[in-house]
Each structure stands twice: as structure tokens, then as C-alpha cells.
Amino acid sequence: MAETTITDIKQSAEQKMGKTLEALKNDLAKVRTGRAHAGILDHVLVDYYGNPTPVPQVANVSLVDSRTLGVQPYEKNMVGKIEKAIRDGDLGLNPATHGDVIRVPMPALTEERRRDLIKVVRNEAEGARVAVRNIRRDANASLKDMVKAKTATEDEERRTQDEVQKLTDKFIGEIDKMLAEKEKDLLAV
């Protein structure tokens, strides 16, 4: 009985750490590098009949070239709203409307903007590291509770803490790797 509970704690910790890593991957994808990619507008919300809706749900977002996106709304009356949402978003983009197509040029990143974005990415990564460490802390607290309740021995607790620590190290290593890749992307001119 005690083994399955310890296994549950390890599996739960690994699952939560995996979700933290996935969340970081999504957060890093939002940070704009100099290149255009359709996913950059996924988190820009436009008012669609009173509901905040992601741009890709109300328009076709495509790559015109490596530094320009084309946004073609499904409904012509949405052109102005989508353009305003993109402009007001915190991505620093300046869309231009040509008929019923919105062109979104990706401005080249200035050195100062690159430094700012690197700070943002480092903060995101640090937040993920903290989350992983908190998951480790919670797992260790659960183990201590099991020892107090006499459903696990102190040896099992120590062994499992070591395994959870190895998991923590593995996920923090992944976070550092993702951060290094994103920084390299941002510094590439």
C-alpha cells in the first residue's frame, strides 16, 4: 500500500513539472524574435461580438514572407477591430490594412529591445524554476506526512526525496536549455 502512494507522489510531481515545462514553452513562444511566425498572434484577443477571442479564430493568419504576416478576417467588419487589437497588443507591432487584408510587418529588434526581451525570457524561466522547486517542496511535504502517519518508512522517504530531486534537476536542466535557445534566437540578427 505504501509503495503505491509513494509512486503516486513521484508521478504527480513529474506530471506537474511536465506541465510547468509546457507552460514555459508556450510563454517563450509568445516572445517575439525578429522573424514572423503565425503563432505570434495566438494570444492577441479581439472583441468578437462582446467576447474576447484570439485573432486566429476570427481571421486566417499566414506568412507573407519571413518578416511579414498576412491577416485576412473571415468577416469584413472585423478588419478595424483586429487591426486595433494587434496594434494595442504588447507585441510592438504596427499593422497596415490593404483592402480586407491586414499586413503585419515585423520590425527589426533594436539592441535595447533585445535586452528587454532577454530580461523577460529570463524572468519567465526563473518563474518556471521556482514552480518546479515548489512542486518538489510539496512532494517532500507529502512524504513527511506519510512518515508521520507511519505509511512510509524514513528510508523510503529519503530514497523518494532523492528521486524527486533528480526529477527536479532534470526539469531545471530542460528549462535552462530552453532559455539558452531562446536567448540565442533573440541575439541572432
UniProtKB/Swiss-Prot annotation:
One BP term from GO: cytoplasmic translational termination
Pfam entry (one): RRF
Compartments, as annotated in UniProt: Cytoplasm
Disulfide bonds: none
Keyword Protein biosynthesis: yes
Keywords: Cytoplasm, Protein biosynthesis
GO MF term set: ribosomal large subunit binding
A Gene Ontology term for the protein's cellular component: cytosol
UniProt similarity note: Belongs to the RRF family.
Described function: Responsible for the release of ribosomes from messenger RNA at the termination of protein biosynthesis. May increase the efficiency of translation by recycling ribosomes from one round of translation to another.
Protein name, UniProt field: Ribosome-recycling factor
Species whose genome carries this gene: Thiobacillus denitrificans (strain ATCC 25259 / T1)
Lineage of source species: Bacteria, Pseudomonadati, Pseudomonadota, Betaproteobacteria, Nitrosomonadales
Gene assigned in the entry: frr
